[in-house]
Amino acid sequence: MDEFVKGLMKNGYLITPSAYYLLVGHFNEGKFSLIELIKFAKSRETFIIDDEIANEFLKSIGAEVELPQEIKEGYISTGEGSQKVPDHEELEKITNESSVESSISTGETPKTEELQPTLDILEEEIGDIEGGESSISTGDEVPEVENNNGGTVVVFDKYGYPFTYVPEEIEEELEEYPKYEDVTIEINPNLEVVPIEKDYEIKFDVRRVKLKPPKVKSGSGKEGEIIVEAYASLFRSRLRKLRRILRENPEVSNVIDIKKLKYVKGDEEVTIIGLVNSKKETSKGLIFEVEDQTDRVKVFLPKDSEDYREALKVLPDAVVAFKGVYSKRGIFFANRFYLPDVPLYRKQKPPLEEKVYAVLTSDIHVGSKEFCEKAFIKFLEWLNGYVESKEEEEIVSRIRYLIIAGDVVDGIGIYPGQYSDLIIPDIFDQYEALANLLSNVPKHITIFIGPGNHDAARPAIPQPEFYEEYAKPLYKLKNTVIISNPAVIRLHGRDFLIAHGRGIEDVVSFVPGLTHHKPGLPMVELLKMRHLAPTFGGKVPIAPDPEDLLVIEEVPDLVQMGHVHVYDTAVYRGVQLVNSATWQAQTEFQKMVNIVPTPGLVPIVDVESARVIKVLDFSRWC
């Protein structure tokens, strides 16, 4: 594999053969650098560099090139013969599978000929499955090699794009790597731990929900039919839960089903509630397609509406309400827009007898070469009472909970070329190393720990737990409680919603002006929509569970997320939102795309008020 393709794959980017031949000559001539190309692809919000992206990039640097004849004719040499490259029509059909403007039926099929049956659309998105393994994306990016001779082959990624791939040669690991068996920290004998009785309850955990498999026409039905029905059940569940929340708002009145709009007389003002199938901005306003369990309708919200700015930020597949008038032309003209949102006023909770604190963290990434082990060990020493001031001594003596929100290890095979970024290349040893470190957390502190996308767990969310056969050392820690992603922990009567935070990716992709650099704002948008990852078919793989377990059914006192490696906080309508940063220093890829993590920052939360009272800074050891 040449350095051009190898460099792209190492940084998580794929390239089609036609794009390769467009770009490689200019790259070899030094007309652009790999960093420039990756930044350009990132600005287009894609990790696949096809001929369209390549042409745009070449124009931006003032260069163009003709395709070689064999590419024009649709063939690519692999060294093992020629293989046919799918034509544009085939690729368009394949890439339509990842469209976010999907339509999910939640009831009867609309009678209008213009509205395609929703299950047909889902079948197009998911594909026909004759049996065996599911074709639903699991988040794995590693392609299957089509031969076993170690040669270059053309393979296809999960989106159907062909790219040149050479199996990564992994040298036998000869040198020893750290598993931290020698890290032993005794509690400071001078620390006087305040006797506080623990009071916690796992209020919600994915594993506790009993899910019934969806009913299909016959027991011998195809796997694809079952998955389609599971997703349809998921969206019905979402609509039902969020419809109930919306109807608790006194302003959301006179609600009717979309199918009954045709019976509304004259200019009578009514409210509809449904899933957002699509959203389009025009010079005069926004046009939505909204669907409920009975039908679909086009909704127009004018630009001068007081809710226009809020409506502009709504994600595909979110559940919303519109108030307005139905036109006989089949368009609903809205004058108000409502999100499920958080109530303005909530009942105040009684004070606690004793001050008690919780520590929030995430994204430890044990196993990565960039894991800040010195900083993390300093943090463990701090928990054991080796502090720098009387104020810190008072706080640490009252800490009873440590909450870790996913990506506790760096994992294996998460992205192309990851092996070269690992100091611990074995997934079992990564969890053993983490357990050795966490065994130094004082026994009076309860650790809650859940999975993220780098962990050995189901890739699609919600994630019930770690795969125990890989993460067994964590399950053996006596003061540790394994939780799901998401989970709700009730601490002394206060509800803490813990999620890894992958939904932030979709918010940043769809909402102008929001970035990973300030994750508190995307977290607020998710809270307003009362959902942790609303968009189906976006960047976040969602499991085909018959019930939507990502709906925020009850308003928590605090929301903790991680994933983006940047510390940030926000308070929205009385809810504290915290992104708990990372223990991984900036990687080479992050440098190229200008992602600046904030490792070693640790928020301390007063459980009574559910507010961050202090942020510890261990970054100087990173």
UniProtKB/Swiss-Prot annotation:
Residues 76-113 are annotated as: Disordered. It catalyses: DNA(n) + a 2'-deoxyribonucleoside 5'-triphosphate = DNA(n+1) + diphosphate; Exonucleolytic cleavage in the 3'- to 5'-direction to yield nucleoside 5'-phosphates. One of its GO terms (molecular function) is single-stranded DNA 3'-5' DNA exonuclease activity. The keyword tRNA-binding does not apply. GO terms for cellular component: DNA polymerase complex. Residues 96-109 have a biased composition (Polar residues). One of its GO terms (biological process) is DNA strand elongation involved in DNA replication. The keyword Nucleotidyltransferase applies. Keywords: DNA replication, DNA-binding, DNA-directed DNA polymerase, Exonuclease, Hydrolase, Multifunctional enzyme, Nuclease, Nucleotidyltransferase, Transferase. Residues 85-95 have a biased composition (Basic and acidic residues). Its EC number is 2.7.7.7, 3.1.11.1. Possesses two activities: a DNA synthesis (polymerase) and an exonucleolytic activity that degrades single-stranded DNA in the 3' to 5' direction. Has a template-primer preference which is characteristic of a replicative DNA polymerase. HAMAP family: DNApol_II_A_arch. NCBIfam families: PRK04036.1-2, PRK04036.1-3. Belongs to the DNA polymerase delta/II small subunit family. This is DNA polymerase II small subunit. The lineage of its organism: Archaea, Methanobacteriati, Methanobacteriota, Thermococci, Thermococcales. The gene is polB.
